[in-house]
Amino acid sequence: MNAYYEQDADLKYLQGKNIAVLGFGSQGHAHALNLKESGLNVCVGLRPDSSSCEKARENGLEVNTIADAVAWADIVMVLLPDQYQKSIYESEIKPNLKEGNTLAFAHGFNIHYNQIVPPGTVNVIMIAPKSPGHLVRRTYTQGNGVPCLIAVHQDYTGEARQQALAWAKGLGGTKAGVIETTFKNETETDLFGEQAVLCGGSAELIKAGFETLVEAGYPEELAYFECMHELKLIVDLYYEGGLSRMNYSVSDTAEYGGMTRGPRVITSDVKAEMKKILEEVQDGRFAKEFIDECNAGYPNMKKLRESNADHPIEKVGAKLRDMMSWLLKK
């Protein structure tokens, strides 16, 4: 995959245009502020009763309702939660889109699964920073940026790709590198990674390890330290230099034990189940399940949240984290 940098992008494709950023959460505040400080004309679209209205104004941004922001804008970036985008699109975005506008997203879920079907007379693009919003913002203020993905779903004006690259440049992304992909590939890999590894697989691995030690008679505190707390040390090594950096940094005992026992935990059966999870993402079964869950008021999700909150690892973890002065208390 090719990477694009500063010389490959030109802010002229956004200059002189009205840009609306819908939402002012983690990504929304970073996009709006970075683009504004890149010299672009930005407003934020929010519900009138949103607690973020005051925050956005305190940061020197103009705030409008979502409908008014879209009506004013040439380019609209939708940075709202996936489950709310369809209804807001139908009621406030779609009626105010104009021919030649650009509709932008930071995640492809609603476009890829046809929850949102824009008219053929607009550009549809994606700019997805591969970092949380606070890091997008911080690196920009330091004169750097984070890697970004871009994609073009629909190019009505002939400038969709240039606009996506320009947006990434306005975020600071072209200083790190920008990779072009598709809505399909971004959506499916993102969902799979969340479910099988990052949020689902890792959480279940942690709980299973904790339970194994506790059921064998070891103190919960030791089980927490070994299966939850110390995971950050290992993940940071992965993050900084991959698997080889981790293996180089740990003891020979840990390296040998990990290489010989790890495959007994993540077996061919586990990988087969991962493939099934990927198939559910690819064929839309997961998307339908999630949308149905949202429409029903999250009955299953509420039960799962309660179950996780009641797990013993959460109780002992809260107690041990109170001993850690370096952690921010919330």
From Swiss-Prot:
Pathway: Amino-acid biosynthesis; L-isoleucine biosynthesis; L-isoleucine from 2-oxobutanoate: step 2/4; Amino-acid biosynthesis; L-valine biosynthesis; L-valine from pyruvate: step 2/4. It comes from the Bacteria. Binds 2 magnesium ions per subunit. Involved in the biosynthesis of branched-chain amino acids (BCAA). Catalyzes an alkyl-migration followed by a ketol-acid reduction of (S)-2-acetolactate (S2AL) to yield (R)-2,3-dihydroxy-isovalerate. In the isomerase reaction, S2AL is rearranged via a Mg-dependent methyl migration to produce 3-hydroxy-3-methyl-2-ketobutyrate (HMKB). In the reductase reaction, this 2-ketoacid undergoes a metal-dependent reduction by NADPH to yield (R)-2,3-dihydroxy-isovalerate. GO terms for biological process: isoleucine biosynthetic process; L-valine biosynthetic process. Transmembrane segments: none annotated. This is Ketol-acid reductoisomerase (NADP(+)). SUPFAM superfamilies: 6-phosphogluconate dehydrogenase C-terminal domain-like (SSF48179), NAD(P)-binding Rossmann-fold domains (SSF51735). Keywords: Amino-acid biosynthesis, Branched-chain amino acid biosynthesis, Magnesium, Metal-binding, NADP, Oxidoreductase. It comes from Chlorobium phaeobacteroides (strain BS1). Belongs to the ketol-acid reductoisomerase family. It holds the Pfam family KARI_N. Substrate binds at residue 251. The keyword NADP applies. Signal peptide: none annotated. Its EC number is 1.1.1.86. GO terms for cellular component: cytosol. Residues 1-181 form the KARI N-terminal Rossmann domain. It catalyses: (2R)-2,3-dihydroxy-3-methylbutanoate + NADP(+) = (2S)-2-acetolactate + NADPH + H(+); (2R,3R)-2,3-dihydroxy-3-methylpentanoate + NADP(+) = (S)-2-ethyl-2-hydroxy-3-oxobutanoate + NADPH + H(+). Its cofactor is Mg(2+).
